[in-house]
UniProtKB/Swiss-Prot annotation:
Induction statement: Transcriptionally up-regulated by both L-arabinose and D-xylose via the pentose-specific regulator XacR.
Catalyzed chemical reaction(s): alpha-L-arabinopyanose + NAD(+) = L-arabinono-1,4-lactone + NADH + H(+); alpha-L-arabinopyanose + NADP(+) = L-arabinono-1,4-lactone + NADPH + H(+)
Role noted for this protein: L-AraDH initiates the degradation of L-arabinose. Catalyzes the NAD(P)(+)-dependent conversion of L-arabinose to L-arabino-gamma-lactone. It is highly specific for L-arabinose as substrate and can use both NADP(+) and NAD(+) as electron acceptor, with a slight preference for NADP(+).
Name of protein: L-arabinose 1-dehydrogenase (NAD(P)(+))
InterPro entries associated with the record: Epimerase_deHydtase, NAD(P)-bd_dom_sf
Subunit structure: Homotetramer.
PANTHER family xref list: 4-EPIMERASE, PUTATIVE (AFU_ORTHOLOGUE AFUA_7G00360)-RELATED, NUCLEOSIDE-DIPHOSPHATE-SUGAR EPIMERASE
Length: 254
């Protein structure tokens, strides 16, 4: 059993993560404000001292706190996604954390196959495969902030020996939400089919992210479901952390 601190625990991925880990680990949810039904440590990721105090005595940090809006303005992502992530890494170092799982995103590579460069959540009809180690091509300030977060984690891994997993998370939706999205224009529906992450696969992926022995650090892998329309590779995720996705958007929308 590990002691795990989860920032951004009230978000969609955060709630799934806390539920997935709570049965086998001692989980400390961390949120920006009180949330109904969630007993959490309340703090602002812009407060490094508060983060350090919250991380003390833990083994692993799962850093999910961020402004996740791909249309967010620069000031918003700068303060939370960039400044806040720096604070999380500094606090993790001060608290002697063993592993940090950083919630990155498919948006670090989305410009490779975007249908409309002004609309991050669209996908071209002729999408080509993008490898995990291909150069970043973010589609938004949000994507830029996650490229920074990955690079920062790589630095802390190489400089300080912190075990770092950059987890490029797709779009967490229920099956019903996926079906609803199919009524939107085709470039959006195509994006959803490619980037879907089911709740069940998200739970499994987050468990593997904290429990698997990493073959290398820093390490970056994708976390989406086994969608027929995906252009991001899951080979590295399966090999590195033993992820075995069970869901496929094609079976949901057929």
């Amino acid at each position: 059993m590990a002691r795990i601190a989860v920032t951004g625990a009230a978000g969609n991925v955060g709630r799934v993560t806390v539920e997935a880990l709570a049965s086998d680990h001692d989980v400390t949810p961390i949120t920006h404000r009180e949330r109904e039904g969630l007993d959490s440590v309340i703090l602002d990721v812009r407060d490094e001292d508060a983060l350090t105090e919250a991380f003390e005595g833990h083994d692993i940090v799962v850093h999910l706190a961020a402004n996740p809006n791909p249309d967010a303005a620069w000031d918003s992502v700068y303060e939370v996604n960039i400044g806040g992530t720096y604070n999380v890494y500094e606090a993790a170092l001060a608290a002697d954390i063993d592993r940090l799982v950083f919630a990155s995103t498919n948006h670090v590579h989305q410009m490779y196959n975007i249908a409309d460069a002004t609309r991050p959540e669209t996908l071209a009809a002729d999408a080509e495969a993008v490898g995990v180690s291909d150069p970043p091509r973010p589609d938004s300030y949000y994507g830029v902030s996650k490229v920074f977060g990955e690079a920062l984690g790589n630095y802390y891994a190489d400089r300080h020996g912190l075990e770092v997993l950059n987890l490029r998370i797709g779009w967490l939706l229920t099956a019903d939400e996926v079906r609803e999205k199919m009524d939107e224009e085709e470039s959006v529906a195509r994006y959803v089919r490619a980037m879907w992450l089911s709740p069940g696969d998200c739970e499994q992926g987050m468990r593997r992210a904290v429990e698997a022995s990493l073959p290398d650090s820093p390490l970056a892998v994708n976390l989406i479901s086994a969608n027929d329309d995906r252009y991001l590779s899951l080979t590295e995720t399966m090999r590195a952390i033993g992820y075995r996705p069970r869901d496929n958007s094609a079976t949901v929308v057929e």
